[in-house]
Every structure is written in structure tokens, then in C-alpha cells.
Amino acid sequence: MPKPDIHPTWYPDAKVICNGEVVMTTGATQPEIHVDVWSGNHPFFTGTQKILDTEGRVDRFMKKYGMGTKKKGADSAKAESKA
């Protein structure tokens, strides 16, 4: 038997609300739960996700910070000047 007056009120039919629309009911300690995203409007679950061009972003970073591949002409010119 649980101790009296220490447990929250249980709502077996709590409404989950997204954008002003009831999307599902569940059990919770609050009568209404307001959410911004749920599986019905999340891009991953709806199949409308945008695929980023990660290769282009990496190349842009490498060029910006000088971590890209070195030119062969520059290496041979340095070697000739040292000799």
C-alpha cells in the first residue's frame, strides 16, 4: 500500500497535444502534455528528411583551414630551393 499524500495524481487518459491538436492519449501525472515534435510530424519518421551534403562541407573546411591536399608543384619547388 503506498503512503498517502506523497504520490502525484495519476491521469490514465492524459492528452498529448502538438500544435493545438490532440495526437494521442497516454497515462501521465499531468492531464495535458504539450509537445513541439512527435513521430507524426518529425522528418525522420515521415520520410521527408533533408540529406545534407556532408562531403562538400568537409572539403570546404579543409580548404578554409589549409588542411587540404598539398599541390605537387609546391612540394617540388620547395625541394629544389633547399638543394
Curated annotation (Swiss-Prot):
GO terms for biological process, alphabetical: translation
A GO CC term assigned to this protein in UniProt: ribonucleoprotein complex
One protein family per Pfam: Ribosomal_L31
Domain of life where this protein originates: Bacteria
InterPro entries: Ribosomal_bL28/bL31-like_sf, Ribosomal_bL31, Ribosomal_bL31_A, Ribosomal_bL31_sf
Molecular function terms from GO: rRNA binding; structural constituent of ribosome
Record carries keyword Ribosomal protein: yes
Keywords linked to the UniProt accession: Ribonucleoprotein, Ribosomal protein, RNA-binding, rRNA-binding
Function: Binds the 23S rRNA.
Similarity-based family: Belongs to the bacterial ribosomal protein bL31 family. Type A subfamily.
Assembly information from the UniProt record: Part of the 50S ribosomal subunit.
Protein name: Large ribosomal subunit protein bL31
Species this chain originates from: Synechococcus sp. (strain CC9605)
